[in-house]
Amino acid sequence: MGFMNMKVLVVNCGSSSLKYQLIDMENDKVLCKGKCDVIGGSMDAITPPFIEYKGRSGKKIKEVLPLKDHLDAFKAVVRYMTDADEGVVSSLNEVGAIGHRIVNAGPFFKESTLVTDEVLKTFNEKSIPYAPLHNPPALLGINACLETMPGIPEVLVFDTSFHQTMPEKAYMYGLPYKYFEEYGVRRYGAHGMSHQFVTEEAARLMNKPIDELNMISCHLGNGSSITAIKNGKCVDTSMGFTPLEGLVMGTRSGDLDPAILEFVMDKEGIDIHQMLKILNKASGLLALSGETGDVRDLRELRKQGHKRAAMALDVLSYRIRKYIGAYMAVLGHVDCITFEGGIGEHNPDVVKACVDGLEEFGIIYDDSHIDDEMYEGIVSTPESKIKMFVIATNEEVIIAKEAMRLAK
């Protein structure tokens, strides 16, 4: 099989889900995509286990079926991929590599790596605590692929790799040094694949060599992060040891005074695990508005005069603007700012609010795009010294490219 004709399967496993895409690397075309969900659930439940698949015909197929574990789910994916009518490969030998998205493996893996027995042992024994919600299901997905598609190279691609170029002054916390030395406590960041994709895309749009590009990438979705990029490399990012640090998000608190934890735990009579669940699942825009963490719904509520929804959106745009200003100071010179992710790509009024008041710094939003919620491209005026782009991010392409690079 030729290198450029390689088809790469991209896999992203959650605790009860498995998302997948098969990409033809010759033209970055998605041959099939879908997900298995409610893995491990009962067939008698209101929402029983199911697979969604979109393949040869382009028609979305949904089948309810027993999926007791990730292995069952992966077998269902393989069955559809090789199906006589809707399949996209005649045999699994056409798949040249499998790329797995890994949120954070701690200090043990700094870049994408081929799966070997030693790699699996290290990941299983040492990396799980650095993303305790995400890493166990990722491991289940890796093992399911190994059993179902033996002999096909598997590659772990880390959401933290793009941020490994951060200097020490950006990733260190002001904590006892032994926490860093012995436990790997430092800032790792997240959304690295998205930030990497938009950096490459911004270099193309700016017609500038990537190693000469200074930019600020704003990945804004239910989880959000902002990254400062100097000469094409990450030098700082808003998320930290976990994705809890940084911006106010859909249900995550973002930056806060750590002393609040003890104060609230004492008042509420809760333990640290309950507190962390609140910070991750019951904070952010959801907590501020008292209604929802979804920006689309918050915008509708604001139109209806909902004061807390308006306040939540104000807090969101203020925090983003504050990080943009900080990263302008970090970079010195900025060529462009990008907005990506569900919020960044489909909420122009929110994007505009993030840069309102920055005109003195040469950042001017083009108001002609304010009503266009499907626009992709430049959103700054010709007079704006710093260009702004809305870019549809594609993390799967980065995973596939990394898998292809290491499997060739």
Roles of regions detected by a PLM:
Residues 13-14, 101-103, 220, 338-346:
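Glycine-rich beta-strand-to-loop/alpha-helix junction loops that act as flexible
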Residues 17-68:
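Short glycine-rich, Thr/Ser-proximal phosphate-binding strand/loop in the N-terminal lobe
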Residues 80-96, 204-209, 324-335:
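Phosphate/pyrophosphate-binding loops at sites that engage ATP/ADP/AMP, CoA/4′-phosphopantetheine
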Residues 81, 85-134, 155, 161-170:
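Short beta-strand-loop/turn "lid" adjacent to the catalytic site in phosphate-handling enzymes
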Residues 162-266:
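Glycine-rich phosphate-binding loop of actin/hexokinase-like ATP-binding domains
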Residues 277, 284-288, 295-330:
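Adenine-nucleotide phosphate-binding core of ATP-dependent small-molecule kinases
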Residues 335-357:
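Glycine-rich phosphate-binding loops at beta-strand->alpha-helix junctions
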Residues 345, 366, 370-408:
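Glycine-rich phosphate-binding/hydrolytic loop that grips phosphoryl groups
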